[in-house]
Amino acid sequence: MKMLDLYGYTSIAQSFDKICISIASPESIRAMSYGEIKDISTTNYRTFKVEKGGLFCPKIFGPVNDDECLCGKYRKKRYRGVICEKCGVEVTSSKVRRERMGHIELVSPVAHVWFLKSLPSRIGALLDMPLKLIESILYSGDFVVIDPIATPLSKGEVISESAYNQAKDNYGEDSFIALTGAEAIRELLVRLDLHAINANLRSELESTTSEMKRKKIVKRLRIVENFINSGNKPEWMILTVIPILPPDLRPLVSLENGRPAVSDLNHHYRTIINRNNRLGKLLKLNPPAIMIRNEKRMLQEAVDALFDSTRRSYVSNKAGSVGYKKSLSDMLKGKQGRFRQNLLGKRVDYSGRSVIVVGPNLKLHQCGLPKKMALELFKPFICSKLKMYGIVPTVKLANKMIQNEKPEVWDILDEVIHEHPILLNRAPTLHRLGIQAFDPVLIEGKAIQLHPLVCSAFNADFDGDQMAVHIPLSLEAQLEARILMMSTNNILSPSNGKPIIVPSKDIILGIYYLTLQDYVEPEEILFFGDFSHVEYALHNKDIHICSKIKYKMNYCTDSSDGNGPTYYSKIVETTPGRLMLWQIFPEHKNLTFDLVNQVLTVKEITAIVDLVYRSCGQSETVEFSDKLMSLGFRYASQSGISFGRMDMIIPDTKTMHVDNASEKIKEFAVQYQDGLITKSERYNKVIDEWSKCTDLIAKDMMKAISVYDEESKLNSIYMMAHSGARGSASQMKQLAGMRGLMAKPSGEIIETPIISNFREGLNVFEYFNSTHGARKGLADTALKTANSGYLTRRLVDVAQDCIVVEYDCKTHNGFAMRSVIDGGTVVETLDNIILGRVAAVDIYNPITKELLVNAGELIDEAKVEKIRIAGLDAVKVRSPLTCEAKKGICALCYGRDLAIGDVVSIGEAVGVIAAQSVGEPGTQLTMRTFHVGGTAMRGVETSNLIAMLDAKVKLVNSNVVEDKYGNKIVMSRSCDVVLLDSVGNEKMRHSVPYGARLYVNDGQLVKITEKIADWDPYTMPIITEKTGIIKYMDLIDGVSINEVLDESTGISNRVVVDWKLHLQGANLRPRLVLVNDNGDIITLSSGLEANYFIPIGAVLSVQDGQKVHAGDVITRIPRESIKTRDITGGLPRVIELFEARRPKEHAIVSDIDGYVEFGKDYYRSKRRIFIKPVDDKLSPVEYLVPKGKHTIVNEGDFVHKGDLLMDGDPDPHDILRVLGVEALANYMIAEIQQVYRLQGVRIDNKHIEVILRQMLQKVEIFEPGDTMYLVGENVDVEEVLKTNSNMEKIGKSPAKYIPILQGITRASLDTNSFVSAASFQETTKVLTEAAFSGKEDSLYGLKENVIVGRLIPAGTGFLMNKIKKLSLLNKDDYSMYYNSEYQDLASIEAGHACSVSPSQGVSDTSGAVDY
């Protein structure tokens, strides 16, 4: 324990392990109190002294001044503990006025508003009475029968006052007991036998068959059991004594004009005391009952107002209005409440803020701190040094010396700040890189200087941004700042493991310019053998930086025979600029000259920084980055790149492309007028045509702009965009191409595009259309920033207690990872997905059977390369979702800590990192919406499938018919085209929609770019399987089908309308039937009749009696016009997924494998679908689909478990129920990543998996077995496993359960820690629940520990807790514990020296000392 004392660790905050909460009994309130308060007086208006016996009474609460009684008789420390015989005040510290409580003895009991009105009403549940009735007893003067004695009245019956008087007259004065007000409720609660109620409810639960009744019983039973288990008594919910807060927590402050500013609580207490005293006096006078009842009601309302003003039945002033008085609940909840304002976030001393300016001369670990600021911040340090050196005798003189800025002060300041890191923070701090440590360098001026490379981590720019400075004071804080938070230790981004200290903007432009090469061949190419000669030639202007030269490059390789390295040289064709860049590279065999001998854009430069980090380690990377930055800045200035109007080159082909598009659009208009296409089809085709036209113009513009010109060399704007320094192809397209389509605020695309570009200038109409996008961008920014910030807060709250608690949980479970293919193209390779994960099983090469990776081994870059060469298409890796560690996760299931590039350290708060990684880009993207200027960024709908490589085709679930033109038409709803390589490994898989034309056969070999299939992207067809004659069934004009006349074309289409709106439409089943020449219904290959059911909104393509051929389209269902997809649409999608909300019109998922059969009858407004299982012994599963919804299956189709039966997004809860956790994880990850990928943001899957793990912490009991659980109860997974294990040990049957998915808000509120839940949302509800359940908080998470003022149990705090545990054990336990846990921990920590070791710090050459 001595070691802990060294850090002052055994403070009060450390001396307890749990926090318990329960309802305060009247006895405990009196025991806590130092005296009863009966007087409302506060201070004397003349002397301003506090009044005795009043709300600030010093006799009860303690002295106002330290060690001084009220009358002044005793005035020194030596009298401590003495109680003055004159004024009765104890002589002690005035601090006791923050701790000592008082109380009010109520004349009549009152109900506690939290237990009465916080839904579900706890009092109501115990008494089995509706809240309305209880309120009528409390507030309206109704009576409740407590004991009917010999009358026909029943116990608990509520009667009005007139009925009560009538009963008294009928049965006599004492023939029954009935009471009103809180006394009545209290009497009922006192008489409750909770154990008997519990037994009755359990037997009722077993016998009931009604689901609704069962839910009601379970709710009540849970409350009854909580009361029994917690030891709380029901009558304690009715107050007979009210505690009074210590006076210093509700102070009386005098304002400048002498008037007192009174805390709202004092107002509430005065009202209660006044009404209580008045009621007491009234009772002595024996007045009419109505007066007493009214006074009791007023007392009840006054107490309600004190505890929770918002829950009173009559609220005179609503929250936020002028006369509103804050209640105790208001003090706790919300952003300004005690939890969030004072406990989770505090204002800090030793801090300052100022504007930031760029500091290009700083090293990466430095920041420029203004001298004046440093002087103020380090004042106490300077004072102590001045005293220590004997320069001044007192602190007062030292302060004066600092104020006068004497020369000695500056010398001491230099000494003080040496090796003393400071923290810089820029708001909003969206991820952990928003606060970093730097070594301060004193500068003149008043602005903080920031290193340019850390700007992207802070998301800072120099247009007036401000940053805050904080000083770590204690030795431990300085140590943590230097080892963990130093900017040089934060090179990689925690969200994706890519370098975040990468050059950008000017630096990129400078390096790009440096690596350019002249396109014009020189008359003679000069040879150089040494770099000094190249520098000499450059100085003499014999060559230019971009000139082509030949250079003798020396190489060194390790010889295979083990005789040491071999040296050789080679002539390379390069430029002086590239050689100059090569000089700053560190020496390593992975870093070859080929890396530099190319034009470097931002992508290549990022890859180089990454490679340097992986190969040479941290200190080399830091040095390299600094040198790269200096070089970039230098050559960006020297290049003379500028931005001119004539640099925006408008392509000559623009007019041609616009004319062609206009012609096509006229064609579409004609087709529409002829009735060949519908209105929405025409709209979609127009949008697509303009998108194509814009893209063609952009392509031609890029071609024109990227031409190398002998006079002006490369185009400046092209260089900026191509290098990735500033601007994008889409912005250039708007400058010199064509602005393109614009979106309305609703998200619809306006079909008239903006043909002009910014160089030509927009006309009035085009300018007006542009305003939509600009305005939407600004409005989005304002609204969505708040949404995104709130999402981050919820994510942090749900994941904050997810910490790495052990190295290996020994599980063999995991998920099979595959590359992500979207629209036939690989959007995320398998390499990227498995890098940094741990193999769940041994991985072998499928051909050579060579072992590539052992189970439990980390897959690093080298192993990824092996797996790629082996051609594996799926790899099983461990995942946080399958981790079996208790109260956290294990290091191996998490894998690599992306910020350090090695297995994650034990004690790492991976939950918070995951939440920040997912939340941070959301905010960034929403702030960035308007940069594209709102031009419609919609891609052209994919309508075909092209082979991306030479391969063999494999068709899965293909059911094909041939139409009259000989085309193969896909009739299957789940047809997949798989492309296999020569070995037979799956390289690409694409689903082909129903109705597509197929150009290949199963087993056919295809060449790259060969077309495999195509389809109409704007409509969903219904296609005949056989040749025959169409017959309309239940398609009645004016009821189920309408001739919809298009006014603009005069053409009418036959559209199916909602037939349920008509009286005669109730039993209709609109369908097309296929008959033969005799009029008999044709039987399909599945053995079913050819009935084609038509949904609402479908357009019929055939007439009644028309002959059709197999493969003909008989009905078209238009798809909706596609809206613009940007993160504005994307952020709500991410929120919807994390909140596990049921999509508005969600698709129905098949629970089993089987054949589709449509029910013969309609069930009210629903349509029946049966899935008939393959096994005839099993009964079919019935689904009810809303009438008119388009089912995407036909009668007789075979569907697999988990297939969709109708259009729409599947419900995540259904996926979990039907297909399990892995399928749910795959779906959620795919959907969330799709939104981020659309914006070019990369987040590692493991972060989403960590959040999902927290969302899957609860299970639902469906069979309790011999346990005490109830059916339908939601319980923690760990708790159930523990209970089941105990049950099995004693030979009893365990509980059976299914996993459930909770949204992040629900999961945060259902956490085991009531302290954490209360500080999140619904504070009063959470505390009410916790109090009557007598909950314990074991303080496992981060938030709870911050609130109680301890070190968080992550990082340093995690190890401290280990040491604390060790120190409390006796010798035998100690050695056992040490061998099992600590040994393991020590070995891992040693292995993780890379994250904290001195050698990884900044090396001497960069200006810092090894620490």
UniProtKB/Swiss-Prot annotation:
Cofactor(s), by name: Mg(2+); Zn(2+)
Coiled-coil spans are none
Binding note for cofactor:
Binds 1 Mg(2+) ion per subunit.
Q: How does it assemble?
A: The RNAP catalytic core consists of 2 alpha, 1 beta, 1 beta' and 1 omega subunit. When a sigma factor is associated with the core the holoenzyme is formed, which can initiate transcription.
> What does the function comment of this entry state?
DNA-dependent RNA polymerase catalyzes the transcription of DNA into RNA using the four ribonucleoside triphosphates as substrates.
NCBIfam families, per the entry: rpoC_TIGR
Protein name as annotated? DNA-directed RNA polymerase subunit beta'
